[in-house]
Swiss-Prot record:
Name this protein carries in UniProt: Cyclotide hyen-J
Source organism: Pigea enneasperma (Spade flower)
This protein's domain notes: The presence of a 'disulfide through disulfide knot' structurally defines this protein as a knottin.
SUPFAM superfamilies: Cyclotides
UniProt KW keywords: Disulfide bond, Knottin, Plant defense
Domain of life: Eukaryota
């Protein structure tokens, strides 16, 4: 994951996970 999805996942999971993003270092990234 190298492209940030503009969402953090410190308190809640990535909502952008439906678009293929995943949590890494408290930030959502697109793999």
């Amino acid at each position: 994951g190298s492209v940030p999805c503009g969402e953090s996942c410190v308190w809640i999971p990535c909502i952008t996970s439906i678009a293929g993003c995943s949590c890494s270092n408290k930030v959502c990234y697109m793999d």
